[in-house]
A protein has these predicted regions:
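Membrane-embedded transmembrane alpha-helical bundles that form the catalytic cores
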Residues: 1-417, 423-463
């Protein structure tokens, strides 16, 4: 079940809100847990048991590590065992087929595999479970917790499918003691509507234009057309994912949870380094805290620092999917970050901020070619068309049509990807709140109409 669906908005969510707010305080976590499991089971009736196993296993291992620490015993073997089991489960479902393909290629074997459906949200809830284990080991979580609190932490439906990746220490108190006032609920509803409209009105529209370019006969894919297509995808993935994060943050606030922001206008970044401080913040924080810093971070020799960055970014790419494209995508950013650290910043510091923003944006646009393509061959072919290496025309009639059809939504998206719209809306709220609420109502009506009358409603991060 997606947040951007009629079933969720007009059936599931009202039923949950009613049950949650009429139930006594001591039952609220149980209500949330039941509905979260139903939410997950809607699309994964079998794999819900895998998530429950993950919760039970990591909860028991966390308690064992705590017990060892309190009795002055060495908990490291338990930590290593727990990490191995989590990584094995994630790898089995996510990378089994990819690993078999690599073995077949390297050793010229012919092993056949039956494709396994990927459990929804497994990358997210596995990373949350690991952060809980690491935080216990590092004495950042120091008390035994009730199982209901831990399984709710892993399965809580707002952030279950697509994040943000929540650390236990950030919501530990909220799982036990939380309150919701009208201001919290109103803010949550506002964030949900804004996220829904970003997803449905912007991302879905942009995605239809990107699909139009992808499905063109190759002879019709001019340089201008493929640039328009990947620019549409660039804004699509931002509004798709940030819109879902907005909805998750808003839903969490309706039930008293304060999740951290996951995006901070990444397309206004003046460098790739800054971009990754603004894009998918919770994932970047996870890798930095639990992998990059333990490896030594930047407090090591330049060669070791470069090695650390390449490892972290290879794994960041691999986290997104079992495909060479994602590894290349991660390495692309890793190499750019290394170049910025040791060379490019000296040049960038001499360039105006506006030019830096444009250069960074183009750099990020190029990266999405790897992300949006099915294979590495397809990605490099697309890049060849972008940079005139394929002997195709710069523009043709199809390119003119797509440009004329998409230019308005691209311009709207460009403005909405900056703080300008948010600042204007906040100013309107402070002076004429009724008009701001009217805008939210219109956005909700338009989003609902779009969901009813159009069938194109993908979610790009759903597969991770």
């Amino acid at each position: 079940m997606l947040f951007s669906s009629i079933n969720f908005i007009y059936y599931f969510l009202p039923a949950l809100l009613l049950c949650y707010y009429i139930s006594p305080k001591q039952f609220k976590n149980y209500i949330l847990l039941i509905f979260s499991l139903v939410f997950y089971s809607w699309g994964e009736p079998i794999y819900v048991f895998l998530m429950i196993f993950s919760a039970a296993f990591n909860y028991s291992m966390g308690n064992e590590i705590l017990t060892y620490q309190q009795s002055q015993k060495n908990p490291k073997p338990t930590l290593i065992f727990t990490v191995i089991v989590n990584i094995f489960i994630l790898s089995f479902f996510k990378y089994y087929g990819f690993a078999t393909d690599i073995v077949n290629t390297v050793f010229r074997t012919d092993f056949h595999t039956t494709p396994l459906p990927l459990p929804i949200g497994i990358s997210f809830y596995t990373f949350q479970a690991l952060s809980y284990i690491f935080d216990i080991y590092n004495h950042k979580v120091t008390k035994h917790n009730r199982f209901i609190e831990f399984i709710l932490y892993l399965s809580l439906f707002p952030q279950l499918i697509a994040g943000p990746i929540v650390q236990y220490k950030d919501v530990e108190n909220q799982l036990r003691y939380r309150t919701v006032d009208m201001q919290d609920f109103g803010y949550g509803a506002e964030r949900f509507i804004i996220g829904l409209s970003k997803k449905v009105l912007l991302a879905n529209t942009l995605g239809s234009f990107h699909n139009m370019v992808i499905k063109m006969p190759e002879s019709s894919q001019s340089t201008a057309a493929v640039w328009i297509g990947i620019i549409c995808f660039t804004f699509q993935i931002y509004f798709d994912f940030s819109g879902y994060s907005d909805m998750a943050i808003g839903l969490g606030r309706m039930f008293g949870f304060h999740f951290k922001e996951n995006f901070n206008y990444p397309y206004i970044s003046k460098s790739v380094t800054e971009f990754w401080r603004r894009w998918h913040i919770s994932l970047g924080s996870w890798f930095r805290e639990y992998l990059y810093i333990p490896m030594g971070g930047n407090r090591v020799s330049p060669l070791r620092h470069i090695f650390n960055l390449l490892v972290v970014w290879s794994l960041t790419g691999l986290w997104h999917g079992a495909n060479y494209n994602f590894i290349l995508w991660g390495l692309y950013f890793g190499i750019l970050l290394i170049l910025e650290k040791y060379f490019l910043f000296r040049i960038l510091d001499k360039i105006s901020n506006k030019i830096r923003v444009c250069l960074t944006f183009v750099t990020v646009v190029i990266s999405w070619v790897f992300f949006s393509s099915e294979t590495a061959t397809e990605a490099f072919s697309y890049l060849g068309k972008m940079f005139f290496f394929k002997g195709i025309p710069f523009a043709n009639a199809d390119a003119h049509y797509i440009f004329a059809s998409s230019i308005l939504i691209i311009m709207i998206s460009a403005v909405c990807s900056t703080p300008l719209v948010s600042q204007a809306f906040e100013m309107l709220k402070s002076k004429k709140a009724i008009f701001a609420n009217f805008i939210l109502l219109i956005l909700m009506i338009l989003s609902t109409a779009s969901l009813i009358y159009t069938s194109y409603n993908p979610f790009l991060y759903f597969r991770f």
